[in-house]
Structure formats: C-alpha cells, structure tokens
Amino acid sequence: AATELFRITKKTKYLKAARKRAHNLNSRLTAQGWFVSDNAERPFYHGVEAGLPIIALVDYLAIERNRNIKEKTKRTIKVSLDNQIALNTQVTNPFNLARQTFVSEKDGQASKIQESFFTPHDENVMWQGENARLASLTAAAIYGGKISHKDPQGAFGINPELASFAQSQIDWLMGKNPYQISMLYGFGVNNPPHARSAGTMS
C-alpha cells in the first residue's frame, strides 16, 4: 500500500513507509533463502499468496532510487528464487511442483522445520487449496526473475530454469498433474464437478 500511495502522491512519507517495509522483508530473509514469519523460527508460508514477498519487493523497486537499497532488495529476490529452485530439485519431482519450507503445529507444539509439497493444514479450521499458491509463485518467479534472473532470449524474459519452474506451476493448474484435471473451471478437461454451494461460475 505504501508503494502505491507514493506512486500516486509522490509524498516522501509514503516512500519512507515503503522503505521501512522493504527493509523488514529484506531483514527477514534467512541465509537458507526462506523468509522468517511471525517469530524467529517459523518460515513464511501461505496457502494463497506464497509469492507475495517477492511480488511486493518487485513493485517497491519501481519507486526506489537509492542504489544501495535497490541492490539489497535485488539480492533478496535472487536468493529467495534460487532457494525455491534448489528446494524443487532436492527430491524426485516429475511435475516440478513448488515445494516449501514450513513448520506445523500440533497440541500447541511446533514441529521442526520441514520441506515438502503442499500447504500443511494440521487440525485447525483453515482450509485452502493449492491453486492460488501456485499461481502466486508463478507471478513471483516471472516478475522477480526479470530482475534477478534476466534472459532476454528466454521464455518470460527469464533464465530457463526459473522459466521452467513458472511454466510448470501453470501446467499443473491446467491439467498436467497426476489427476489429469484442469483446475481452471471451464477450461481444459476433467474439471472438478460444480458444487452448488459455490454459486454461479459461468
């Protein structure tokens, strides 16, 4: 919000606010390449907006003119995206599906840091599918990659490895998955059946 407010008003107070938030995000990146969440031990993961930290930093870079701050922010983007690619290649992953670092909780006790596919839901009331998370990571890979992994000749203008990652998430959504189901309602084949409780989708 601070980035957009500065973009519209050009008021210095919003640039300062955007810088503060960018500094906070840059400071939350660990040496391993994941972002610290609400305490010093829990990695950031999200059922919908897994790519938001990178997307927000890319947007912020468009208004920042301080060279040192820009370089630090670009480094954050690069390290985070490099970590995502490394995470994906640590295990057999025929669909190149995005993996993540997370901590689960049971009976008030946090687990050790884990790496896996899909968002863990534990036993709480949260329910969230993976589709938005994968789309968010695709956006982060493409927008962030144009800054940190640029390749003018590559797909999406980014290097082949990151482009393959981005495309693989969309491929999964469109039906290149073990279920051969297109997750985008009305497109592809074998769409999940329409649930009356979902209301009108057409």
Q: Residues of each region from the PLM?
A:
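Glycan-recognition and catalytic cores of secretory/periplasmic carbohydrate-active enzymes
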Residues: 1-202
